[in-house]
A protein has these predicted regions:
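C-terminal nucleotide
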Residues: 1-27, 52-88, 186-334, 349-382
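Gly/Ser-rich oxyanion-binding loop with an adjacent helix/lid
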Residues: 1-22, 28-32, 38-41, 80, ...
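N-terminal cofactor/phosphate-binding cores enriched in small/glycine residues
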Residues: 32-34, 46-47
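Short Gly/aromatic-enriched secondary-structure transition segments
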Residues: 39-46, 228-229
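A short, compositionally biased micro-patch
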Residues: 46-48, 58, 120, 183
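FabD-like malonyl-/acyl-CoA
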Residues: 132, 345-349
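Glycine-rich phosphate-binding loop
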Residues: 342
Length: 382
C-alpha cells in the first residue's frame, strides 16, 4: 500500500527530496458511547483500517494537499498563513485544523508541505475517519519538524482541540485517543475525565468481533451530536444545584435516580440517564471481559444499544434493523450501534461457528428490508 502511494505522490508532486510515509488507525468502540464528553469511561480498540499520508517538506510556506479518495477535487492549495476553516477547503479543514493547533501551542511550522492522503475507513461510518486523519497529521508534523517532546496523548488532545475549535464538532477525546494509543489485539479502557487508561486484551477464543456498515452516512457537525452535548451539560448544571459532582460520570445509577428530578426537562433527563448508565455499563463490561464472562459483556452491549436508541435517540431505522437482525440470530452474543450515531456501523460479538450464517443472513435480510446492501463480508470480521 505505502509503495503504491509513494509512487502516486512522486507522479503528483515530483520525485525529489525526503519523502516520508505515515499511518494512523481508525477505531471501533465496543461499549461506552457518548460518555467521553460526560466524564465517563470508554472501551475502544484500534482497527487495521485507517489513514495513510505520504509527505515532504517544501522550501516555502505553501500547503498542497491531495486525497486519493477524492481524486476529482485535485490538489487543494493554501498556505501556512491561511489556516482558517472554509467550506471550500473541504476535507483539508481537518489537517489544517491540526496545523493551526500546533501553531497556537507554540509549535512553529517553518516549512510548507506536500501531502498525499489515502484512507480506507468509509467516510461517515462511525469508525473515526476524521480522528484518524487528525492523529495522522499530528504524527506527521511531530516527525517532520522534530517536535520530539510531544507525546502521543498530547497528539490525541491536539486532534480533539482542533475538531472542537477549528471544525466546530464538540467531540470528546475517545476517537483521537484510540487512534493515537491503539495497540494490536487490545482495547483501551479509558477514563475520559482523568485520561488514566489500561489495555485489555480482546482476543476472544470462541467468538469474533464483526463490524457491519449500514451505508447510511452521517455528519457529526451537521447532526444532532452537538445538541446532545449541550443537553448533557445543561442537565449536569441542574444536578450540580443538589449534588457535589464534576461530571455525569461521577454518579452511580442509584444517585442519579434519587436526584433526577432536579433536571427540569424530560428530554434532558433521558440524555443524562444514558450518560450515567452507559458509564456504569462500560465499567461492568470490562470487569466481565477480564473474568472471561463474554455473555455478560454481550448483554451489556445490548442494553447499551437500547439506551442509545430510546434515551439518547442517536440511532436510526437502518441501524435498528441491523441490530434487531443480529439479536435474532443464534450465536450472537451482543450487538449495538457504534460511533456517534445517526447511521454508520454496528458492532457485534458472534460465536465462531455462527459468523458465516450471520454474514449471510444479516446481509440478505438487510438488503431486502432497506433496499440497499450493507457492507458486510469476511473482511468485516476483526
Amino acid at each position: 500500500m505505502k509503495a503504491r502511494l509513494v509512487e502516486q505522490f512522486k507522479q503528483l508532486f515530483g520525485p525529489e527530496g525526503d519523502i516520508r510515509a505515515y499511518f494512523a488507525p481508525g477505531r471501533v468502540n465496543l461499549i461506552g458511547e457518548h460518555t467521553d464528553y460526560n466524564g465517563g469511561h470508554v472501551f475502544p480498540c484500534a482497527l487495521t483500517l485507517g489513514t495513510y499520508a505520504i509527505a515532504r517538506k517544501r522550501e516555502d510556506d505553501r500547503l498542497r494537499l491531495y486525497s486519493a479518495n477524492f481524486e476529482s477535487l485535485g490538489v487543494i492549495e493554501s498556505s501556512l498563513n491561511d489556516l482558517v476553516p472554509s467550506e471550500a477547503a473541504g476535507w483539508t479543514n481537518y489537517p489544517k485544523g491540526v496545523m493551526w493547533t500546533f501553531e497556537k501551542r507554540g509549535y512553529k511550522l517553518t516549512n510548507g508541505l506536500d501531502i498525499l492522503i489515502y484512507g480506507n475507513i468509509p467516510n461517515g461510518s462511525g469508525l473515526s475517519s476524521s480522528a484518524s486523519l487528525e492523529v495522522l497529521t499530528g504524527v506527521l508534523l511531530k516527525d517532520m519538524f522534530a517536535f520530539d517532546d510531544l507525546t502521543m496523548v498530547e497528539i490525541a488532545q491536539i486532534g480533539q482541540y482542533s475538531e472542537n475549535n477549528f471544525n466546530g464538532c464538540n467531540c470528546g477525546i475517545m476517537d483521537q485517543f484510540a487512534s493515537a494509543m491503539g495497540k494490536k489485539d487490545n482495547a483501551i479502557f479509558l477514563d475520559t475525565n482523568t485520561l488514566q487508561y489500561e489495555y485489555a486484551p480482546v482476543v476472544l477464543e470462541d467468538a469474533k468481533i464483526v463490524i457491519v456498515n449500514s451505508k447510511v452516512k452521517h455528519s457529526l457537525v451537521d447532526s444532532a451530536y452537538n445538541d446532545r452535548r449541550n443537553e448533557c451539560e445543561t442537565a449536569l448544571k441542574e444536578l450540580q444545584k443538589v449534588l457535589d459532582i464534576q461530571t455525569l460520570g461521577d454518579l452511580t445509577e442509584e444517585e442519579f435516580e434519587a436526584n433526577k428530578d432536579a433536571i427540569q426537562s424530560e428530554i434532558r433527563q433521558k440524555r443524562a440517564k444514558h450518560a450515567v448508565y452507559e458509564n456504569r455499563r462500560t465499567i461492568k463490561a470490562v470487569e466481565a471481559l477480564k473474568a472471561d464472562d463474554i455473555e455478560t459483556f454481550g448483554k451489556l452491549m445490548n442494553a447499551s444499544h437500547v439506551s442509545l436508541r430510546d434515551d439518547y435517540e442517536v440511532s436510526c431505522e437502518e441501524i435498528d434493523i441491523l441490530v434487531d437482525l443480529a439479536w435474532s440470530i443464534e450465536g450472537v452474543i451482543g450487538s449495538r450501534i457504534t460511533g456517534g450515531g445517526f447511521g454508520g456501523c454496528t458492532v457485534s460479538i458472534v460465536k465462531n461457528d455462527a459468523v458465516d450464517h450471520f454474514i449471510e443472513t444479516v446481509g440478505a435480510q438487510y438488503e431486502e428490508r432497506v433496499g440497499h446492501k450493507a457492507e458486510l463480508d469476511r473482511k468485516s470480521v476483526v
